[in-house]
């Protein structure tokens, strides 16, 4: 709002950079990258493609990746065993079955810090990715696809259905990230959906269940195998 911008800044969502790039606030890094192959080659194959705004209607690369994250569902092997779950789920139908088994065994399936929307986003965003794919998500960012579109509303409904199945800890709407992590690391809940940067946090903790922690990829929908 002051018209003054820092030389370098961190921004978490690439789609949000579109307006700034269009208004000339950001520097197009394409030429700089092409002129310095050594620098350009320090990035993993495909990493820069994510930051190419041409999909959003603006030609050029206006940001660079600063870390590589992997989303996963972290789970407590001992609680899975207690509920009679013999293997981790690969499909959403298998996840639904495992949730039912956990609930039947008196175990809360997911810890969720619903008070922090970005935490809840780990579940919803994965559902979105597994239903509409990368192209669909890009179209949401450009406005070509609407949040009221049937397939997007379906993703919201699937998230609500998980809540209605008892998948989330009671009162999760008022819980924050720290509460979620505490529940998982003390064995109160069987799973959390998160990304790889939490791994050091978990293993630097004094949790007594570290040997029971493992992870699996967010399950896919059998009718959408192309987004597996």
Which residues does each predicted region cover?
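Extracytoplasmic "Venus flytrap"/periplasmic binding protein-like
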Residues: 1-46, 50, 78-83, 87-90, ...
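Short, solvent-exposed loop/beta-turn-alpha elements that line the ligand-binding surface or hinge
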Residues: 30-46, 114, 131-154, 204-207, ...
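Extracytoplasmic/periplasmic solute-binding protein
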Residues: 53-66, 71, 96-145, 160, ...
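Beta->alpha turn/N-cap motifs
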Residues: 11-15, 177, 194-199, 219
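Glycine-centered hinge/linker elements that transmit conformational signals in sensory
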Residues: 99-101, 141-172, 218
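Hinge/lid segment of periplasmic solute-binding proteins
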Residues: 14-72, 96, 123, 151, ...
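Extracytoplasmic/periplasmic substrate-recognition and gating elements
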Residues: 2, 82-83, 165, 204-228
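Short helix-initiation/N-cap motifs at beta->coil->alpha
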Residues: 1, 15, 92-96, 172-185
């Amino acid at each position: 709002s002051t018209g003054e911008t820092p030389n370098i800044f961190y921004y978490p969502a690439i789609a949000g950079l579109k307006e700034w790039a269009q208004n000339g606030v950001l520097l197009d890094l394409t030429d700089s990258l092409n002129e310095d192959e050594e620098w350009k080659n320090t990035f993993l194959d495909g990493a820069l493609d994510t930051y190419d705004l041409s999909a959003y209607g603006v030609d050029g690369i206006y940001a660079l990746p600063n870390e590589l994250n992997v989303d996963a569902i972290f789970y407590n092997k001992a609680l899975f065993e207690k509920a009679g779950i013999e293997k981790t789920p690969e499909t959403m139908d298998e996840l639904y079955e495992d949730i039912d088994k956990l609930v039947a065994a008196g175990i809360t399936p997911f810890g969720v810090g619903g008070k922090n929307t970005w935490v809840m986003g780990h579940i919803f965003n994965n559902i979105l990715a597994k239903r509409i794919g990368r192209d669909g998500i890009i179209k949401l960012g450009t406005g070509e696809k609407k949040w009221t579109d049937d397939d997007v509303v379906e993703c919201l409904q699937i998230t609500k259905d998980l809540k209605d199945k008892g998948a989330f800890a009671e009162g999760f709407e008022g819980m924050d990230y720290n509460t979620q992590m505490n529940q998982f690391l003390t064995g109160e809940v069987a799973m959390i959906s998160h990304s790889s940067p939490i791994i050091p946090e978990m293993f630097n903790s004094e949790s007594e269940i570290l040997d029971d922690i493992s992870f699996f990829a967010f399950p896919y929908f059998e009718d959408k195998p192309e987004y597996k």
